[in-house]
């Protein structure tokens, strides 16, 4: 009995050593098994990294699609609310029920028009996000190339596990063959097991290369497409906000002008009742001693906003439109002012403008 137990123990130790050696060769347990085994290990590690990379990119693409879809749903609701507000503003403006002027009526109409334009721009942006961002990414997440590449990697992994199991079987039969003292049947089974292991290893190498190539191609497509779609999303949102800013700037100017109509005094008397504008010689000479209170010589130039339009009659008069800004250089006691607007200089009624201490830089640039 003791002899049998000792023999069984020796056999177990021998099989364990052989299994360890085979696992090193086929399981990547060491680098001393030759160039082919090192290449197989590198192939296996490369496939693992590619699999993780493509899976993470797929999840990120899916997150972008979900985020964009949620943004579209929320934005569509905002478009609906904004459109309703636009219609209400237009309705109030068109009914014109106010008995004390129509300033608010015009402001409501302007707001309704601008709000409709902004909601149209928002709708265009949401449409672009759907067609240019969500749809291409969704197509790639659900596309065949990614699934095919991942299936190849999974087949490779299963074949690798099968090769490891077959390597264990070869080790077991090798031990049995040594104990059988040349039994033909056992040797034949060993040769068959070794041939199967060789075929598995060859097929595993070929399949690993195919899977790595397919996954690398998918990874490259994922990186490029996702970056392009992110850039497209940024460009769409940027264009939307720029357009909305332009609409709001114009709307603000219109509404400020309407507010000034309420705050400003009634339109000044017609320039026809005023004396003609002085010549530049008179302004520089005769009037120099008469402008102690009204001349700008002592206080410098200043900017004025045009409250009422003025159409010049003579060559020395300056035509102005409501909302424009003019650099006032001289004011006479007769009610005339001299200044420059949009590169043109001339005289105009001083009562048609109002001095402004603070002016947007964009408005100042329009003066010259």
Swiss-Prot record:
Occurrences of domain SH3 (ranges): 299-358
Quaternary state and interactors: Homodimer. Interacts with FREE1. Interacts (via SH3 domain) with ATG8E and ATG8F. Component of a phosphoinositide 3-kinase (PI3K) complex containing ATG6, SH3P2 and FREE1. Binds to SH3P3 and DRP1A. Forms a complex made of SH3P2 and DRP1A and triggers its accumulation at the cell plate.
Annotated BAR domain residues: 1-264
GO cellular component, one term: nucleus
Coiled coil region boundaries: 1-21, 146-210
Keyword line: Cell membrane, Coiled coil, Cytoplasm, Cytoplasmic vesicle, Endosome, Membrane, SH3 domain
Record bears the keyword Signal: no
Naturally occurring in which organism (per UniProt): Arabidopsis thaliana
GO MF annotation terms: phosphatidylinositol-3,4,5-trisphosphate binding; phosphatidylinositol-3,4-bisphosphate binding; phosphatidylinositol-3-phosphate binding; phosphatidylinositol-4,5-bisphosphate binding; ubiquitin binding
Primary location: cytoplasm
Membrane topology: Peripheral membrane protein
SUPFAM superfamilies for the chain: BAR/IMD domain-like, SH3-domain
Origin superkingdom: Eukaryota
A Pfam family this chain is assigned to: SH3_9
InterPro entries on file: AH/BAR_dom_sf, Endophilin_SH3RF, SH3-like_dom_sf, SH3_domain
Subcellular location: Cytoplasm; Cytoplasmic vesicle, Clathrin-coated vesicle; Cell membrane; Late endosome
Function according to Swiss-Prot or TrEMBL: Regulator for autophaosome formation and/or maturation. Binds phosphatidylinositol-phosphate; highest affinity for vesicles containing PtdIns(3,4,5)P(3), followed by those containing PtdIns(4,5)P(2) and PtdIns(3,4)P(2), with minimal binding to phosphatidylinositol monophosphates, including PtdIns(3)P. Together with DRP1A, converts the fused vesicles to tubular structures at the cell plate during cytokinesis.
Name under which the protein is recorded: SH3 domain-containing protein 2
Residues that span the membrane, as ranges: none
Effect of disrupting the coding gene: Delayed germination, but almost normal growth after germination in sh3p2 partial mutants. RNAi plants exhibit cytokinesis-defective phenotypes associated with the aggregation of vesicles at the leading edge of the cell plate and abnormal cytosolic localization of DRP1A in dividing cells.
Gene name per UniProt: SH3P2
């Amino acid at each position: 009995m003791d002899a049998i137990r000792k023999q069984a123990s020796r056999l177990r130790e021998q099989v364990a050593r052989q299994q360890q050696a085979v696992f090193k060769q086929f399981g990547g347990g060491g680098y001393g098994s030759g160039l082919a085994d090192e290449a197989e290990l590198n192939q296996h590690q490369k496939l693992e990294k590619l699999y993780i990379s493509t899976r993470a990119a797929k999840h990120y693409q899916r997150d972008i699609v979900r985020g964009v879809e949620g943004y579209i749903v929320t934005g569509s609701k905002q478009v609906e609310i904004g459109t309703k507000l636009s219609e209400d503003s237009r309705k109030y403006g068109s009914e014109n029920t106010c008995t004390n002027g129509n300033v608010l009526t015009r402001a409501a109409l302007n707001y309704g028009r601008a709000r409709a334009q902004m909601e149209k721009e928002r709708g265009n942006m949401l449409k672009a996000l759907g067609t240019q961002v969500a749809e291409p990414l969704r197509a790639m997440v659900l596309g065949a190339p990614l699934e095919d590449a991942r299936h190849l990697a999974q087949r490779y992994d299963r074949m690798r596990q099968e090769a490891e199991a077959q390597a264990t079987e070869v080790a077991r039969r090798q031990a049995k063959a040594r104990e059988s003292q040349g039994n033909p049947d056992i040797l034949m089974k060993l040769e068959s097991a070794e041939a199967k292991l060789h075929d598995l290893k060859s097929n595993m190498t070929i399949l690993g290369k195919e899977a790595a190539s397919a996954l690398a191609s998918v990874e490259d497509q994922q990186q490029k497409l996702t970056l392009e779609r992110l850039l497209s999303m940024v460009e769409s949102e940027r264009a939307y906000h720029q357009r909305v800013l332009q609409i709001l700037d114009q709307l603000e100017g219109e509404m400020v002008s309407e507010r000034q109509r309420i705050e400003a005094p009634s339109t000044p008397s017609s320039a026809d009742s005023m004396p003609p504008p002085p010549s530049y010689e008179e302004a520089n000479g005769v009037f120099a001693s008469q402008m102690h209170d009204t001349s700008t010589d002592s206080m410098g130039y200043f900017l004025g906003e045009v409250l009422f339009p003025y159409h010049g009659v003579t060559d020395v008069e300056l035509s102005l439109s409501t909302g424009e800004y003019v650099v006032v250089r001289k004011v006479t006691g007769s009610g005339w002012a001299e200044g420059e607007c949009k590169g043109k200089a001339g005289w105009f009624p001083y009562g048609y403008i109002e001095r402004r201490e603070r002016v947007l830089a964009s408005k100042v640039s329009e003066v010259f």
